[in-house]
Structures are given as C-alpha cells and as structure tokens.
C-alpha cells in the first residue's frame, strides 16, 4: 500500500523484491570540498548573522514568489530579527534578471547568491544556511539532505504534499488557497513561522 507515503519510501520499496533492506530513508547528497569552501567564503562576510536562503522560482513557472510578495517577506523577517542576512537563490538562466531585481530593492540585508552553475554549487550554499524558504520541491529536497530547517510553500493539495514534503527535522509548510497553483498563501505565516524555526534552531 503506497497511499500516504513519501515518494522516497515508494522508490525504496522497489528494492524489496531483491531482498535489499534500506538502512535509512534520508537523502544523501555529495558536494566537493572546493564547492563547500567557495560557499563558506562567500558567506564569511556575514559572520554571526543568521543566514536565510530564499528560492523564489521553481521548475514549474506557476511555482514562484513574485517580487511584491518577496519584498513583504524580506521586510517582515528583518522587522522581527535584525540579525539576519537573506540570500536570494536563482537558477543560472535567471541569475542576471534576479540579481538586478534584488539590487533594485536596495535592502542591505538582502543579497543575491553567486552564480551557481550546477545544482551541487547551489547545494553547497544551502548546506551553510540556517533556514531555507522555497516554493520549489527540488530546493526543499536539497535542504532536507543537510537537515536544514525549511519553510515550504505548497499548493493546497495534500496528496502532492505527502509525496514531496520536506524531510528535515524542523519544517513548516504554508499552503496556498488553490490546489493547482501558488496563489493566496499567507505571507504573514511565512514570516512568523520562519522566525519560530530560527529561534527553535538556536535553543
């Protein structure tokens, strides 16, 4: 019975006919020492700050945080915790556009990530973060591999969420109003839940 199971558990069940028993259903993701060093060097200027990564776009164009909502989230987070640095993540193809948009915001506590040419470059950066906010499940899974606290934004579809939910020890999902698109989610919940996860991680 695969009802109400996460997709990783469904795939692991395919090993049963071969007599293979998985030791864990946690993700593994391997990055190079150079990738990790580069990420640490990039973040070193934000020493003692809580690092929040926000991925604003997904592989599916409907799964995104628009810049009006993003600005509300950014300002709301900073109003509640001044000791943060927010890094905006983007795909290589969208890097220049998003970097320009972030620059136009003029917020000192917000910066674009460096150009991540591969998904493992992005993973190395995510590994160093204290919290990740994302509407895209691929970034959620990367953060889960390193047990980074996660705020995921998901369409109001519990079956889909069960399949692709975060697997970090600490995660909260904010749902949209619709089952097929990310519209009408509560920005205030994203802000408040983010601060709660940061505080929980400190304790």
Regions found by a protein language model. Name each.
Residues 1-203:
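Catalytic machinery of carbohydrate-active enzymes
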């Amino acid at each position: 019975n695969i009802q109400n199971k996460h997709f990783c558990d469904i795939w692991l069940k395919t090993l049963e006919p071969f007599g293979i028993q998985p030791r864990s259903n946690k993700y593994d993701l391997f990055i190079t020492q150079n990738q990790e060093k580069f990420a640490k060097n990039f973040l070193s200027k934000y020493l003692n700050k809580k690092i929040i990564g926000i991925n604003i776009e997904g592989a599916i164009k409907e799964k995104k945080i628009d810049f009006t909502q993003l600005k509300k989230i950014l300002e709301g987070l900073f109003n509640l915790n001044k000791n943060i640095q927010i890094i905006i993540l983007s795909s290589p193809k969208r890097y220049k556009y998003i970097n320009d948009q972030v620059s136009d915001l003029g917020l000192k506590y917000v910066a674009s990530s460096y150009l991540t040419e591969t998904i493992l470059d992005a993973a190395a950066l995510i590994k160093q973060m204290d919290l990740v906010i994302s509407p895209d499940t691929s970034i959620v899974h990367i953060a889960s591999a390193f047990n980074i606290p996660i705020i995921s934004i998901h369409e109001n579809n519990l079956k889909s969420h069960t399949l692709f939910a975060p697997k970090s020890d600490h995660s909260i999902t904010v749902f949209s109003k619709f089952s097929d698109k990310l519209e009408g989610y509560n920005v205030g919940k994203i802000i408040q839940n983010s601060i709660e996860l940061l505080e929980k991680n400190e304790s």
